[in-house]
Structure formats: structure tokens, C-alpha cells
């Protein structure tokens, strides 16, 4: 009896350690969104990101940062998205203090950092924080052959009707292996993330990439016709788990790392 108890205890400890390791190995993401009204604002933010912010993040040990643009004609504004991957939340916490001590960053970004109140470089800036999905714990660089200017990056945001149903949609990606379907069909996803802080919650986001618009259309056609997708989407346990799908087709800034 004692040996059986010790064996079961050991199994439970190992399971706990494994679970902790899996959670600890998941990356943490920040998406900064700049809301712009004028071309002057866009130029100031572009210059800041290209000449100061991205180089400073590189010095801080973040090798690849994605910068993407969205022309929101319906909202009469332009958006610049900055995707920053961190190995952990602790590393994210250390970034701002590091930037404050980076004299080169302060010098290179002076025009943006010291902007006057009546010459602000943006209308609004928001920050979205995400935990990587367990089914795809690390971000991936897209394997594309076309120039950055031709590529289409598709950012999707799935809001859930309730927290419970939102978790069900996340489970559909992980345990239901919707992520595996995307991989099999070569959607070149950069990340899948669960929003832990942002203006839209409960929410998940993911970014897929394509050679061009025709390539995107062909991929989604194959997705909709795939036998596994038809099976997965028809499962009773995965019904009514999404309230709103916000899809945005982004272009890549010429100074983006990918």
C-alpha cells in the first residue's frame, strides 16, 4: 500500500512538473497598435520604429520584430501594428526599464519621444498582451519567397460570447488540432495567442501569411473544403464558441524583420 501511494505521488509530481514546464515554455507577445490620422504622423512613427525602436529591441535581445500596416478606410485612419515576441512575461517586464537606460535609443528616438502635445505622433496607441497557445508555444517566421511588398499577412481576432465559450474555441485550436490543420495546409502562421489584456476580450488572435492575394484565396478555399475541417466544425462540443471574427489584411513595412 505504501509503495503504491509513493508511486502515485511520484506520478502526480511528475505531471505537475511537466504541466509547469509546458506553461513556462510558452512565449508571451505584445502587439502595439498605433492609430494615425495624418501622413506626417505615419512618417514620424515609421522613422521612430525604423531608426530607434527596432534597433533598441535588437540590442535588448529580441531578434525578430514584425511591423505591419492596415489602411482602415472605414475608420478613416491608418494603423501600424508592431508584433514583439518575448520568451516570457518576465522578459517583457524588463524591456521598458532597459529602454529608459538605453542612451542610444533616447538619442535616435528623440523626435518621437520628445514630441510636443500639439504635434503628437499618433492619435492613440493601444497595447495587446497575449499568451502563446499550448499547441504552438513559439512564434514562427514565415517561409515565403515573394518580396515583402507582395505578401499578405492576415490578422484574425476571434471574440468569444462568454469566457467559457472562448476557452472552448481555444481548446478547438489546441486539443481539436485546428492548429494542425493550418500547419498541414501551409498557412505559415506566425503566432496563435490568447489575449490576457486588451480592449476586446475574451479574445484570441492569430496571424497567417501568404505569398500574395491569390495565394491567400487558394489556401482558404482548401481550408473550407478540407474533410477534417468539416468534421471538426460539425462536432457538437465546438458549437457557438465565437461571437465575432475581425479579419484584417495587412501589408508589411519595408523595415520589418519578417
Where do the language-model regions lie?
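Bacterial Sec-dependent N-terminal signal peptides
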Residues: 1-25
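Short S/T/G/P-rich N-terminal loop/turn motif that feeds into the first structured element of a domain
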Residues: 20-106, 111-229, 239-258
Amino acid at each position: 500500500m505504501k509503495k503504491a501511494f509513493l508511486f502515485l505521488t511520484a506520478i502526480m509530481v511528475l505531471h505537475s512538473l511537466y504541466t509547469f514546464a509546458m506553461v513556462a515554455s510558452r512565449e508571451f507577445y505584445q502587439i502595439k497598435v498605433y492609430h494615425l490620422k495624418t501622413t506626417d504622423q505615419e512618417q514620424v512613427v515609421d522613422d521612430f520604429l525604423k531608426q530607434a525602436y527596432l534597433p533598441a529591441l535588437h540590442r535588448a535581445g529580441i531578434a525578430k520584430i514584425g511591423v505591419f500596416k492596415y489602411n482602415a478606410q472605414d475608420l478613416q485612419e491608418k494603423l501600424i501594428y508592431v508584433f514583439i515576441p518575448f520568451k516570457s512575461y518576465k522578459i517583457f517586464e524588463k524591456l521598458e526599464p532597459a529602454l529608459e537606460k538605453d542612451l542610444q535609443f533616447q538619442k535616435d528616438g528623440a523626435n518621437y519621444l520628445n514630441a510636443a502635445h500639439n504635434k503628437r505622433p499618433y492619435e492613440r496607441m493601444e497595447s495587446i498582451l497575449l499568451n502563446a497557445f499550448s499547441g504552438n508555444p513559439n512564434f514562427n517566421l514565415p517561409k515565403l519567397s515573394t518580396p515583402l511588398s507582395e505578401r499578405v499577412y492576415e490578422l484574425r481576432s476571434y471574440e468569444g460570447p462568454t469566457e467559457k465559450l472562448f476557452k472552448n474555441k481555444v481548446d478547438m485550436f489546441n486539443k481539436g488540432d485546428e492548429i494542425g490543420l493550418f500547419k498541414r495546409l501551409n498557412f505559415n502562421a506566425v503566432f496563435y495567442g490568447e489575449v490576457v489584456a486588451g480592449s476586446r476580450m475574451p479574445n484570441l488572435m492569430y496571424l497567417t501569411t501568404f505569398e500574395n492575394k491569390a495565394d491567400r484565396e487558394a489556401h482558404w478555399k482548401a481550408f473550407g473544403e478540407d474533410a477534417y475541417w468539416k468534421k471538426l466544425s460539425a462536432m457538437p462540443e465546438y458549437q457557438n464558441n465565437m461571437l465575432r471574427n475581425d479579419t484584417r489584411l495587412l501589408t508589411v513595412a519595408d523595415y520589418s524583420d519578417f
